[in-house]
Amino acid sequence: MQTRLPFFGVVRVSGEDRASFLHGQLSNDINNLAIGQACYATYNTPKGRVLANMLVVNRGEDLLLVMAQDLTEAIVKRLRMFVLRAKVVFELMPDLVVSGELADDAEPHPAAEPQLSFPAQIQENTVEIALPHTGRLKISVAENAAEYQAGAENAWNLHEIRSGYPWIC
């Protein structure tokens, strides 16, 4: 089963200070996220309230943040407030589409021990992430993305929740 996931939006983060800046803002170790790897992270208030959860993908020359589409503008606006002298550029990527793929017989797979990072295949216009719960997330331009199927999107969302990976929206 494959489907577009219109729930997600993508933000590109570039500039020579991108990893160190995000390392200081997000909950995961972005400085040590290797090229071709992805990780889950959250963006929190100083008191620890989660504002957004996301996937961070290191493509080498930039980082991609995949989060709820409804939150992308507000989170980017808030992150920009803290840039100061850091060499970081945030760019909303409306031309990129997120798709999900699950095997028809995929069972929820709650993590016994959380993975700090997981592999991401990076090709010219596509990033494919092997998620810890047996699903695959694909970030691509629209012509390379799966068609939208409401039933498949519902199955994807249910699979993520049952696997312990809900999304904040």
Sequence positions of predicted segments:
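Basic, glycine/lysine-rich polyanion-binding surfaces/domains
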Residues: 1-169
